[in-house]
Amino acid sequence: MKLTCVVIVAVLLLTACQLITADDSRGTQKHRALRSDTKLPMSTRCKLKGQSCRKTSYDCCSGSCGRSGKCG
């Protein structure tokens, strides 16, 4: 009986500590993971060879936008 009460009190204390620290740590994460550049091509549609492109947007499937403004 005593052991059961001790275990219940310990679980309640640990749960309370978890809830207190979770509230205090919101928005204080220092090193957030940045979105990987490798995920960008997978999440957006790329343009096929010969379609118009911009060198600054990196939207060609081949990865290269030619001088003429078309995917290479």
Curated annotation (Swiss-Prot):
Superkingdom of this protein's organism: Eukaryota
Residue positions assigned to the propeptide: 23-45
Alphabetized GO MF terms: calcium channel regulator activity; ion channel inhibitor activity; toxin activity
- Where Cysteine amide occurs along the chain? C71
Please state the span of the N-terminal signal peptide per the UniProt entry.
1-22
The intrachain disulfides are C46-C61, C53-C65, C60-C71
| Record keywords | Amidation, Calcium channel impairing toxin, Disulfide bond, Ion channel impairing toxin, Knottin, Neurotoxin, Presynaptic neurotoxin, Secreted, Signal, Toxin, Voltage-gated calcium channel impairing toxin
Q: What's a Pfam family in this record? A: Conotoxin
Which tissues express it? Expressed by the venom duct.
Q: Where in the cell is it found?
A: Secreted
Question: Per the entry's comment, what about the domains?
Answer: The presence of a 'disulfide through disulfide knot' structurally defines this protein as a knottin. The cysteine framework is VI/VII (C-C-CC-C-C).
User: What job does the chain carry out?
Assistant: Omega-conotoxins act at presynaptic membranes, they bind and block voltage-gated calcium channels (Cav). This toxin blocks N-, P- and Q-type calcium channels.
Q: Family membership, please give it.
A: Belongs to the conotoxin O1 superfamily.
Protein name per its UniProtKB record: Omega-conotoxin SVIB
Could you tell me which species this protein originates from?
Conus striatus (Striated cone)
